[in-house]
From Swiss-Prot:
Belongs to the Lgt family. GO terms for molecular function: phosphatidylglycerol-prolipoprotein diacylglyceryl transferase activity. GO terms for biological process: lipoprotein biosynthetic process. It is found in: Cell inner membrane. Its main location: membrane. The chain crosses the membrane at residues 25-45, 70-90, 102-122, 138-158, 193-213, 217-237, 255-275. Pfam families: LGT. It is a multi-pass membrane protein. It comes from the Bacteria. This is Phosphatidylglycerol--prolipoprotein diacylglyceryl transferase. Its EC number is 2.5.1.145. Pathway: Protein modification; lipoprotein biosynthesis (diacylglyceryl transfer). The keyword Transmembrane applies.
Amino acid sequence: MNNLVCPAIAFPSFLDPVIIQLGPITLHWYGLGYVVGILFAWWYAQKLLKKPSLWHKNHPPMTKEKIGDFVVWSAISVVVGGRLGQVLVWDPLYYFSHPSSIIAVWDGGMSFHGGLIGIIIAMILFARKNNINIRSMFDIIAAGAPIGIGIVRICNFINQELWGNATTQPWAVCFPLDPYYLPRHPSQLYEAFMEGFILFMILFIVIFTFKAFKRRGTVSGIFIIGYAIARSISEVYRAPQEDPEWFSTLFHSTGFTYGMALSLPMLLLGFYLLLQAFKDKSTENDTPQRKN
């Protein structure tokens, strides 16, 4: 480690990736973050389903019991999809040469884009099995998802991973695990606020003020677009990750990152959902009208 005095905020010494260890059982903040995020989304969805006036034709798309049934589906799909995305998209050579690390989810290394694909597949299958409108299924899950994302980003900070570029800003943080011990952007916290808490408040406003659930697909479309934009902004401040070789060859020194590239399909999907929402003729007599 560099012994020079770091002109920035020292990483809090009391923050440890491990919460508690009891014999062979170790509880990590990272794993707990996923659990809390999923449980919050479940609780929030139940609250939203209790308000029929928010929904298309004043009819919630499913019962509270059904959303409870989906909790297990969501947990499995997010973890499996997120881990497979990390393994196959970000660092396949490392994981194939260290196969035991593939299941070490508690050490970090989850791809948001992989987790998104996993839960989209789970939502489609669950909605078809239970005769639920797919776009409404997307909406109810998207409404609470940003809080989970924000919590996990804070856990990334605790794990001292995905830190930012070196900076002279007064709020820069020196991470002990950084071999150069440079003052860096706490980009994990930027993402926690942009992808998590700010995006949650935007969705909260469009749900309760503009009754966005009535146009099915609107909330999920805004969520996906909002995440893609926030992620692309945060990529500017993130320290470069080891992108796939083919990508680095094509976009070397352009400032265009792999994370930005993966966000482009999300933008297209988000705009597609919004387009379908506003083309849906069944909502024409259901959306609230402004009074003059």
